[in-house]
Structure formats: C-alpha cells, structure tokens
Amino acid sequence: MAYQNQNLKTANFFWGGRLTAYEVSNMFSFFEKGFSVNVWSYENLSLPQEFTLKNAELILPYEELNKFKQNFQKSNMSSFSNLFRYELLMKESGWWFDSDCICIKTAEEFANLASNKPFVLGLENDTLVGSS
C-alpha cells in the first residue's frame, strides 16, 4: 500500500445511535484545532454543520456490525470498532480518534508529526500502544 498523506488534517470518528453533548463537544475540539471532522455511521445522524456525515457502508458492510461476539454477548462493538478503524485508515487515511478524546494539538502539529511516516501510533502508557 502506498503511503497517503492527503488527509493529515482529517479526524475520523465512528458513531451509532444518538450523539450526546459529551461526544459532540469532544469531536468539536478537533474542528476548533483545524481538523476536518468526519463522523462515520450506518445511521442518518443529526450533526453540527461543521462535521461531515460519512456512510460507514463505504468502509464495511452493515452486516459486519453484529458479527463480533465476546463472552456470549449479543455483539461486541469494541471488536467491530477495531476492524472498522483499520479498514478506514487503509481506504481513507487521516486520523482515527475515539469520541471520548479531546484535541489539544493543532491539525498542523499532527500533520507535521506524520509528514514523513507511513503510520503513527499513540502510547497509552510506557508499555502499551493506544488504539483510540
């Protein structure tokens, strides 16, 4: 896969269901720092005009959503989300963030960080790579 850097100032999120003020304010922090904000969903969400609603079907078919089970649960959104984010980043590039993240760096700082790297990972702590 060739390295793509055209979306270094795009923040991507996935959401299903109704967005609360908490998620919207967290996502809005990325817009305020200069990111384009894409919210990927299988639903027709009501979003602030600064955000772009993207059809999650372009990344993974809806049927995949409930295929992942863990400990006899009905479905495991965390497992699906992991697969979705990797597929998204292969197809669209840009950045992936969970909706509980708040942006404190500018889009320009993120773009500079990744300008000559094929990928960037965040650390959760000294021994774990974070995936949000």
Where are these regions (language model features)?
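GT-A fold catalytic core of metal-dependent nucleotide-sugar glycosyltransferases
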Residues: 77-128
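Short beta-strand/turn micro-motifs composed of small residues
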Residues: 13-15, 41-43
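Active-site-proximal specificity loops/subdomain of glycosyltransferases
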Residues: 42-83
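Short, hydrophobic beta-strand segments that form beta-sheet elements in well-ordered domains
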Residues: 34-42, 95, 100
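N-proximal low-complexity "stem/linker" segments adjacent to membrane-targeting elements
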Residues: 1-13
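Short, well-formed alpha-helical segments that are part of the catalytic scaffolds
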Residues: 19-31
